[in-house]
Amino acid sequence: MNIREARETMYELLTLFFKGAAVVYGSQSHAVKEKPPVVVLTTISVNRPMNPPTEIVDGNPVSYYPTNMVLQVDLYTKGALVEVGERQLALVENTALNDMIEFANFVGSEYFINWCHQKDIALALKSDAQDTTALINSASYQFRATLELMMSFTQKA
């Protein structure tokens, strides 16, 4: 597996869990901004050894790079309407953090572990889910939650 394939695997996982949300890669130039719900996948860093384990296969040296890739997942949501009081005023509740924590719970599930085994990867939480909601133009909120994950896999060269 290479970096591109690893990112595609993570993209597949996010579309599996966040059904109905647009999943996009972060740091894309000239990309059209999607309407919420949106999941943004960003690669933070890639670490691998300078001198990987190497073996001879059919007379040729083959190197295996154990690779750790840190990924950031940002979830943007519209929130959920909440009716309060008899006047039926509608408020909007921030659901981004709750949704991200549900994803973090999914990462610990038996289904998820089996999915990772099939893909020959390991995926672990690197941080707690964080509420990163922002006030925009003093008029509206952009509901957002962030989570960092560590994906481990082997590159063959």
What are these regions (language model features)?
Residues 99-107:
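Short amphipathic alpha-helices in soluble, non-transmembrane regions
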